[in-house]
Swiss-Prot record:
Organism listed in the record: Hahella chejuensis (strain KCTC 2396)
EC numbers for this chain: 6.5.1.2
Catalytic activity line of the entry: NAD(+) + (deoxyribonucleotide)n-3'-hydroxyl + 5'-phospho-(deoxyribonucleotide)m = (deoxyribonucleotide)n+m + AMP + beta-nicotinamide D-nucleotide
Gene name of the encoded protein: ligA
Domain BRCT: 596-683
GO molecular function: DNA binding; DNA ligase (NAD+) activity; metal ion binding
Protein name: DNA ligase
Biological processes, Gene Ontology terms: DNA repair; DNA replication
Function noted in UniProt: DNA ligase that catalyzes the formation of phosphodiester linkages between 5'-phosphoryl and 3'-hydroxyl groups in double-stranded DNA using NAD as a coenzyme and as the energy source for the reaction. It is essential for DNA replication and repair of damaged DNA.
Source organism superkingdom: Bacteria
Amino acid sequence: MSEVPAAIQEELNTLRETINDHNYRYYTLDDPSIPDAEYDRLMRRLREIEAEFPQTITPDSPTQRVGAAPAEGFETVSHRLPMLSLDNAFEEQDLLDFDRRVRERLKEAEDARIDYCCEPKLDGIAISLLYRDGYLVRGVTRGDGSAGEDITANVKTVKNIPLKLRGEGYPAELEVRGEIYLPKAAFDAINKDAAAKGEKTFVNPRNAAAGSLRQLDPRITAKRALEMCCYSVGYFEGELPGTQHDILTQLQQWGLKINSQMKLASGAQECLDYYRHIMSVRDQLPYEIDGVVFKVNRIDLQQELGFVSRAPRWAIAHKFPAHEEMTELLAVDFQVGRTGAVTPVARLKPVFVGGVTVSNATLHNMDEIRRLDVHIGDTVIIRRAGDVIPQVVSVVQDRRPENAVPVDRPEHCPVCGSDVLQLEGEAVARCSGGLYCSAQRKEAIKHFASRKAMDIDGLGDRLVELLVEKELIDSPASLYSLKAPDVAGLERMGEKSAQNLINAIEASKQTTFARFIYALGIREVGEATAKVLAQHFPTLDLLKQATEEDLVEAPDIGPISAGHIRSFFQQEHNLETIDALLNQGVSWPEVVVRSTETLPLSGQTAVVTGVLADYSRDEAKDLLTRLGAKVSGSVSAKTGFVVAGEKAGSKLTKAQDLGVKVLDEDAFKQLLEEHQAHLGGEA
């Protein structure tokens, strides 16, 4: 490898310094000082030198933004400090209430004015950047707030994220948080290019940014003109300024982009003025926003105010109303979802709203249709709720034509003809066809074959879809008529795997009553409820004949669940499917009815969270249920104890805050050993 001449090394250093300076002016300050052609010439020369003298390439060179080879997946990384979400304000009064709460907690006078740092709320992807000694070492998505995906290789392709901080005085370790987004012009260019190639276009810039960041090949990410805007810091070692505004200003001096619309406001009224101003210029901004964020400016006051479980008390996001437009309602169709929900869909005269052309919109349910008094032929107002999902929000009554037609709920399922029922207390009408309805067929069979139901090994979702599409099965019962030659010719199936599948289907005939009930897919009947039903109604005939009054006498069965169960067993199609399953040989041993009152954990509510080394979460829940405990998905003051494994998150924190007893895995094992005698067979 030849030695680098001094003159070349000097030119190299000058090129990098010059290019970094232009990147800063272009991407961070939005104030370019040279034409694009001149910038391209500088980059070409830098690449030429590095190609001739590869030993000169450094991780922070401007040329290293183009991604490396594709990754095989993303590693999960825990955030040292949680990346919490913000509480929302939707009305001006919500913001005034927030300001009042802040002043009350700080014991300020009623007429005191708190200083707030105000910024537009970018509609992008939250990201955490970690700098060590000024060098970017890691980029992680927000994820669930406690842990996210390591997308460092992709983050390094975002041109306004410095690979090395400018200047000096930055902390030895500094976590910077912000939003990665796709500017409107870049979004339009990507979609225009995709449309020209006949490819699927993105719905909105946020989806495009998310899809770009999660590319396993950073070279694809590099082709997208993503940008980042910083809004806060997380963990850091050293000192930073004492206000939100000054911290962001300091980040800008270190080479990171902050929002040029950032402003200080004194008191709630100035915050409202800022909100109205940003809303008025929203469409002129080069990026999508969905509101503004207000943060108490002084860091010491932020620390005094603290946090609730999921959000800081010192910040709030004031959301904008969704974009709206008027158009004509041409028709209302009723669609049947995979769970049987019968949903009205408005067919509209196409209208451009919120950046897209909308021709369909949700009407949610019949209650909403009645509330709006919707007629076919009406002029309606369409809103893109959350700037994503179009919905009908109102009717322009004075434009109703004389021939407008009211919208009635269908009495029968538009797919299978079964009764459409709407139970008291429920807004959604549902097809009662259950296992029979073809709209629900694939999902019904997937559920029937799942591990917690009939546990048919090897019958995954994709194979179910293939079997239905090839018309080899049309109901759960038809699974038991399959023969090995029927499936041997399917994708990724051979004679051996086909026979293994048939053997697994045959083995599933021997099950338990609780599993069979769960496998039927009755609405509101989960695994725990199925076990309750099997204990309370130990034969199929007793369960089929149970009235709603009988059902609500069973533990934890409420009137809504009882209504669903009763409705299911009243439908002839469902009874025929059950008979077909029994005729195919599905059976279970007689249920041994246990008295839960004598079980050691009777009357106690337990919660399982985190990762256990020797038990899946479902196994742990099952063991607790068999000891008489009621297993809940959330922690409250009524929780008896929490079983917490590794990486336990917010549930563990809440349990500790409430003083609820916490068992680690060793203590859980000890509990099981103490009551081993009660862990008998399954219902």
